[in-house]
Amino acid sequence: MSTNQLDTKSQAWSALFSEPMSELVKRYTASVFFDKRLWQADIAGSLAHAEMLAAQQIIGAQDLADIQRGMAQITQEIESGAFEWKLELEDVHLNIEARLTQLVGDAGKRLHTGRSRNDQVATDVRLWLRGEIDATAVLLADMQRALVHVASNNVDVILPGFTHLQVAQPVSFAHHLLAYVEMFARDAERLADLRKRVNRLPLGSAALAGTSYPLDRERVARTLGFDGVCQNSLDAVSDRDFAIEFTGFATLVMIHVSRMAEEIVLWMSQNFGFINLSDRYCTGSSIMPQKRNPDVAELARGKSGRVVGHLMGLITLMKGQPLAYNKDNQEDKEPLFDTVDTVKDTLRIMAEMIGGEVAADGSRSGGLTVKAEAMERAALRGYATATDLADYLVKKGLPFRDAHEVVAHAVKDAIALGKDLSELPLETLQGYNATITADVHAALTLAGSLNARNTLGGTAPSQVRAQIERHQARLG
């Protein structure tokens, strides 16, 4: 029978009802075709629950053995693709329980003792999300390693730094990349912190008020690797703040990715020409033969809006719910699942596009190509060393505001002449202020500008190398 066909079997809860659920309602309320991805967490939670029930003598040893045997077969069936997911059984939980009962009889019916789907699904999602958090942490580290790798090879490459997208001051290209490393490092800290709140066990809270059975919740928590148990049964089954928190974290990651992707798109354009991307990360045009479009970066930028939307959806989902569980919470899974998939895929492909493919031995191939000469030409065109001239005058004794005004006049005249400040003759510069001497030209070079910013966190090459070493030691 097709997984989309309905049979006449009643739901696990249907004994009270005098008429069957309409097929439209079945389709509208079923979640199995998206929540079946929780099957491993569901089986793990059920096995831990069954072991605890047996240890507490709530079910017998033979019941436990039968449940374990049945779950092993169900695992094999799901992994092989032979398991039949049935829409009329609503969700992953009842599909697995129904198959278990079919395989082992009454032992399968005893599994749900002391448990509700309310605490079961909350446990499944937390258990699943914990694994995805750990996988995402690895990808975040890989993203940082890719950026550090490119930075380590481009410490002395000079990029025009921008404010308001206008040339501001020269910076090391490596320094620019390391700014994103810092952002992703904070994201990683947020992820590690939220994991502590995700890793709490709801199971044993039952529908909302706890249970009359002598459950050992701490035992189940230890078996499943949770740090502890949720302390209030109403809260445990009804809140999804952990899903909101993860999606909030993911939103920040995607915003950071989006900013970086925007710069990659700009840098690759002919008007900038600062970098090139491998053909494998670009697409062409169906009408314009010359086009090489940075679609990966553009999609990463676009997908940030998708994740922001999921965050807004989850917040809106929770804002009006009274305690305790409500069916609204079924709507938490699709945005959470898609957020996880989007963040993981985006981090993986962006790290590879920037830093190259990583071989088994740790070597890298590919990655973005840096056009150092184009970056330097752009910095020279934008009077990026104007602040350096002002600083030079301050060191000669002028108040900064006076120095600022002097340099503004010099820049205005240089623009009229079509020259950079460093190209103006000494005599011309001395006409703006008599304290200027021949050493001024050293201050007006791009390299001199970088070297002068030798403060902690600054763009001087010595500082940038120290930053790279710090990140390399941290990331391993």
Curated annotation (Swiss-Prot):
Q: What is its main location?
A: cytoplasm
Q: In which pathway does it act?
A: Amino-acid biosynthesis; L-arginine biosynthesis; L-arginine from L-ornithine and carbamoyl phosphate: step 3/3
List cellular component terms (GO): cytosol
Q: What class of enzyme is it?
A: lyase
A single GO molecular-function term is:
argininosuccinate lyase activity
Keyword Zinc (UniProt) = no
Q: What is its EC number?
A: 4.3.2.1
Any single biological process term in GO? arginine biosynthetic process via ornithine
Q: Does the keyword Ribonucleoprotein apply?
A: no
Question: What Pfam families does UniProt report for this protein, alphabetically?
Answer: ASL_C2 (PF14698), Lyase_1 (PF00206)
The reaction(s) catalysed by this protein are: 2-(N(omega)-L-arginino)succinate = fumarate + L-arginine
Listed A to Z, the keywords are: Amino-acid biosynthesis, Arginine biosynthesis, Cytoplasm, Lyase
**Compartments in which it is found:** Cytoplasm
* Record-linked HAMAP family: Arg_succ_lyase
Task: Family membership, please give it.
Answer: Belongs to the lyase 1 family. Argininosuccinate lyase subfamily.
Provide the protein name: Argininosuccinate lyase
Origin organism of this chain?
A: Leptothrix cholodnii (strain ATCC 51168 / LMG 8142 / SP-6)
Task: Please state the gene responsible for encoding this protein.
Answer: argH
